């Protein structure tokens, strides 16, 4: 039997009613109260997520920038200390190794945050391409991550932080902030489509911080949230999930994150030729939104048809808690990607009518 990995918060899940599942080799809570309740809490008040399964890699040294420019698609030279950047790592054929966040903590000090299922693969990929005086260290086991997300997230977190959180703008961060006396890196980032913060602290401090935040946020409606709501929230906001919208066979351009690919940067990064070609002349496939008109919920890998021609497949789908509609994301032949194109999805051996719709499905009002 495979032993599942656990985050430093595992022992407190039960106290809050956490129901755990196997998620890519990790024993993580899929929900605490209910996915719907947690989803709605984040859209209307706030939710707290344990995302300590995510990986963290430190890149340091004189050649750290030159190295990162070679292995990621975005232009890291534009990043200032205190800034975060969303980017991807690609194979030479343009397929995606992973999507990630880069935090610039110092002129020669970067923190990379990578997907849990890819930690070993990413670390090996980075280490095998390291150049000059750059070092790559996997610090995943030492770092815990909590995400507090939702319109009331700032007010709740402000109760246990003396620094003015309004000063931390979107995709910016402050290092060594004290959160209820615990040193942490606090960034205004998230994976829900709402305002919020991601808090990085030492593994041994995570449980105390989790309990304190839930305590001080209770009157504002802060709820403990699991993977289920995290997935429906990111899906409504059309944020890609590695293994579904992104993979070794799907390029960032196809997945709709071309904004994180800077083919005009001088550095010759992995996948640049393919991605440049796709940026200039269009990719063969495109990630689109689909709404099911008849009964049925589109799920990952369900085929999409026009007539007898299979034009692609669903990458993610659900009954949207916010929109009360059955919607999906599908990677399809670009010829059929125009909004209002009528398609069919095969759900349990039955074709159901659907239509291509604009994305994101949900965008918060400022």
From Swiss-Prot:
> Which biological processes are named by the entry's GO terms?
glycine decarboxylation via glycine cleavage system
Instruction: Kindly state which reaction or reactions the protein catalyses.
Output: N(6)-[(R)-S(8)-aminomethyldihydrolipoyl]-L-lysyl-[protein] + (6S)-5,6,7,8-tetrahydrofolate = N(6)-[(R)-dihydrolipoyl]-L-lysyl-[protein] + (6R)-5,10-methylene-5,6,7,8-tetrahydrofolate + NH4(+)
Q: Which family does it belong to?
A: Belongs to the GcvT family.
Q: What is its EC number?
A: 2.1.2.10
Q: Which organism is it from?
A: Bacillus cereus (strain ATCC 14579 / DSM 31 / CCUG 7414 / JCM 2152 / NBRC 15305 / NCIMB 9373 / NCTC 2599 / NRRL B-3711)
Q: Report the SUPFAM superfamilies cross-referenced here.
A: Aminomethyltransferase beta-barrel domain (SSF101790), Folate-binding domain (SSF103025)
Any one GO MF annotation of this record: transaminase activity
Keyword terms: Aminotransferase, Transferase
Organism classification: Bacteria, Bacillati, Bacillota, Bacilli, Bacillales
UniProt-listed Pfam families: GCV_T (PF01571), GCV_T_C (PF08669)
- Task of the protein: The glycine cleavage system catalyzes the degradation of glycine.
Look up the domain of life of the source: Bacteria
Protein name per the record: Aminomethyltransferase
Enzyme class, top EC level, equals transferase
What Gene3D superfamilies does the database record attribute to this sequence? Aminomethyltransferase beta-barrel domains, Aminomethyltransferase fragment, Probable tRNA modification gtpase trme, domain 1
Quaternary structure per UniProt? The glycine cleavage system is composed of four proteins: P, T, L and H.
Q: Which GO terms describe its cellular component?
A: cytosol; glycine cleavage complex
């Amino acid at each position: 039997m495979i032993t599942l990995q656990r985050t430093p918060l595992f022992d407190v899940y039960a106290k809050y009613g956490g129901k755990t599942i196997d998620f890519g080799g990790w024993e993580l809570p899929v929900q605490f109260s209910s996915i719907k309740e947690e989803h709605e809490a984040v859209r209307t008040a706030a939710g707290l997520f344990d995302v300590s399964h995510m990986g963290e890699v430190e890149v340091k040294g004189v050649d750290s920038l030159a190295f990162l420019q070679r292995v990621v698609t975005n232009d890291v030279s534009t990043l200032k200390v205190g800034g975060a950047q969303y980017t991807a790592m690609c194979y030479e054929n343009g397929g995606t190794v992973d999507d990630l966040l880069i935090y610039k903590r110092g002129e020669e000090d970067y923190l990379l945050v990578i997907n849990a299922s890819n930690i070993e693969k990413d670390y090996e990929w980075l280490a095998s391409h390291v150049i000059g005086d750059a070092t790559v260290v996997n610090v995943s086991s030492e770092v815990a991550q909590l995400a507090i997300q939702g319109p009331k997230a700032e007010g709740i977190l402000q109760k246990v932080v003396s620094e003015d959180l309004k000063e931390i703008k979107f995709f910016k961060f402050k290092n060594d902030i004290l959160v209820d006396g615990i040193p942490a890196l606090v960034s205004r980032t998230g994976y829900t489509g709402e305002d919020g913060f991601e808090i990085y602290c030492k593994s041994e401090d995570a449980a105390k911080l989790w309990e304190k935040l839930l305590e001080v946020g209770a009157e504002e409606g802060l709820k403990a949230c699991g993977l289920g709501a995290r997935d429906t929230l990111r899906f409504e906001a059309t944020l890609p999930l590695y293994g579904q919208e992104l993979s070794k066979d799907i390029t960032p351009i196809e997945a709709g994150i071309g904004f994180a690919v800077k083919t005009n940067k001088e550095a010759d990064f992995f996948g640049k030729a393919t991605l440049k070609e796709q940026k200039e002349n269009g990719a063969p496939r495109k990630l689109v939104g689909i709404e099911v008109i008849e009964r049925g919920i589109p799920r990952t890998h369900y085929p999409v048809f026009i007539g007898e021609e299979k034009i692609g497949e669903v990458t993610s789908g659900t009954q949207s808690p916010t929109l009360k509609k059955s919607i999906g994301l599908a990677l399809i032949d670009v010829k059929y990607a125009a909004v209002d194109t009528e398609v069919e999805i095969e759900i349990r051996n039955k074709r159901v009518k659907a239509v291509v719709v604009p994305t994101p499905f949900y965008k918060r009002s400022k």
